[in-house]
């Protein structure tokens, strides 16, 4: 499989400011495979150390802070060779090894000639603890589920992926590309972007195996809930997790605690919800009161929406059968377009530094699905799971904030086009949002 993060890893390798790397990502998103593949492509050899399978490795970090001695002990214990600049050193499953994480300070300061990458499940939880990592002494990188573009590459559709990457004008996509891209996107909604699920489809075309892969991943996540230090939070985390399809099936997708459990209150469940956020199993999107900068200054902390880390996992958790793939556009519109909204949010999270927000108004009701910050501009985004749809909320938003709105963005089943200041992006081009906004802004300035 070709993962686009390999380019970022190569930039890290070649950077004169390189520090030990901590690669974050949910369980089974492909962290270990990526690092091993990176080592195979760009280094003479890879030295791999798994602290879950070989707990004795932890002792080497507990008895000394001397990096040369640590590496000597690791080489003697494992029989692996480590050469400065030539070897990629991978420390895997480090989430329960604070001494290993803290040792990155000494590798950074005293042994920058060694290229070290750390990975582990639930690292977001570990790093949220006080004094759990050396500030300023490590580089962070996030790996998310495979994008639609990566899915196309894995599926052997390099021509379609390459076409999307080379679109450089805001003009309608020819039917020769438009139609097959929508069919492929339907399948991506089914598989999602978890590598094992994608593999079961792209290599074996085995729907049952794909379903089992997604179920196994969900099961692994649910077993992780028990790792919360306060065991009483375990059932609360589980209830929140299982409520997400119901939350997103509502017309108003604002997270409601009573959907989790009748009579539930925020103060009883907010720690459990934060655990899911820190684990990056869910994305928490706050309501914004206005399109101002910095966006965090306008957050309504009492109102937010919750999305799953992956659209395929959401489909499986919601128990939507893969057969919906063949039923016209049903997969796009199923349960209030939740799959489509989750898919778009996934792509925006990976493209923009600032987490998206959303905006609502009551009496009469209007909702802009997302607000995205690109440089110093904020763009309202509406997600439609059908074609030929009106954008009354985008219109209202511009009426209220005319000076702040340079461009409005709509995702739908319609073709690529720019109508005045409304940029319509076909759903299958969501990975190209940042670039397309740039092209649209240039076109409007001409």
Model-derived regions, located:
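Short regulatory helix/loop adjacent to the ATP-binding pocket of P-loop NTPases
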Residues: 124-140, 152-157
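A cross-kingdom feature that marks ATP-driven nucleic-acid transaction machinery
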Residues: 13-21, 28, 37-41, 271-446
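Structural recognition of the conserved hydrophobic beta-strand(s) that form the central parallel beta-sheet
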Residues: 90, 115-121, 142
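Short glycine-rich substrate-engagement loop in P-loop NTPases that contacts/grips substrate
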Residues: 53-84
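Conserved P-loop NTPase "ATPase switch" module shared by AAA+ and STAND
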Residues: 82-99
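Interdomain hinge/linker elements that couple catalytic modules in large macromolecular machines
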Residues: 153-346, 356-363
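Conserved lysine of the Walker
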Residues: 31
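Pre-Walker A adenine-sensing motif
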Residues: 2-16
């Amino acid at each position: 499989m070709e993962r686009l993060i390999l380019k970022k890893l190569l930039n890290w390798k070649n950077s004169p400011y390189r520090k030990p790397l901590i690669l974050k990502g949910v369980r089974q998103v492909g962290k270990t495979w990526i690092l091993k593949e990176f080592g195979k492509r760009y280094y003479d050899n890879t030295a791999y150390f798994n602290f879950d399978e070989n707990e004795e490795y932890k002792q080497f970090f507990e008895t000394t802070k001397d990096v040369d001695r640590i590496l000597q002990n690791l080489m003697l214990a494992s029989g692996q060779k480590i050469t400065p600049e030539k070897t990629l050193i991978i420390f895997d499953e480090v989430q329960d090894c604070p001494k290993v994480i803290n040792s990155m300070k000494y590798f950074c300061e005293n042994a920058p000639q060694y290229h070290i990458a750390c990975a582990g499940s639930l690292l977001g939880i570990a790093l949220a603890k006080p004094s759990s990592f050396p500030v300023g002494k490590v580089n962070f990188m996030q790996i998310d589920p495979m994008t639609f573009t990566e899915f196309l590459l894995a599926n052997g559709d390099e021509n379609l992926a390459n076409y999307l990457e080379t679109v450089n004008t805001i003009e309608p996509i020819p039917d020769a590309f438009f139609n097959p891209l929508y069919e492929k996107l339907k399948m991506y909604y089914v598989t999602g972007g978890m590598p094992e699920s994608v593999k079961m489809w792209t290599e074996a075309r085995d729907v049952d195996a794909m379903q089992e892969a997604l179920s196994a991943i969900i099961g692994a996540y649910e077993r992780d809930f028990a790792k919360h230090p306060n065991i009483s939070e375990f059932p609360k985390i589980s209830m929140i997790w299982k409520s997400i399809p119901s939350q997103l099936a509502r017309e108003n997708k604002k997270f409601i605690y009573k959907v989790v459990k009748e009579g539930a209150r925020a103060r009883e469940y907010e720690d459990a919800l934060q655990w899911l956020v820190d684990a990056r199993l869910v994305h928490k999107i706050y309501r914004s009161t206005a399109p101002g900068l910095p966006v965090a200054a306008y957050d309504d902390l009492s109102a937010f929406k919750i999305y799953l880390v992956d659209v395929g996992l959401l489909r499986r958790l919601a128990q939507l059968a893969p057969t919906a793939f063949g039923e016209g556009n049903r997969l796009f519109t199923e349960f209030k377009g939740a799959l489509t909204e989750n898919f778009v949010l996934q792509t925006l999270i990976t493209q923009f530094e600032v987490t998206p927000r959303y905006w609502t108004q009551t009496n009469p009701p209007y909702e802009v699905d997302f607000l995205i910050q690109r440089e110093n501009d904020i763009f309202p985004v509406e997600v439609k799971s059908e074609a030929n749809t009106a954008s009354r909320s985008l219109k209202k938003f511009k009426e209220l904030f005319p000076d702040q709105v340079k461009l409005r963005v709509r995702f739908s089943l319609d073709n690529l086009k720019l109508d005045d200041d409304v940029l319509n992006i076909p759903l299958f081009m969501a990975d190209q949002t940042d670039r397309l906004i740039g092209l649209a802004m240039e076109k409007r300035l001409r």
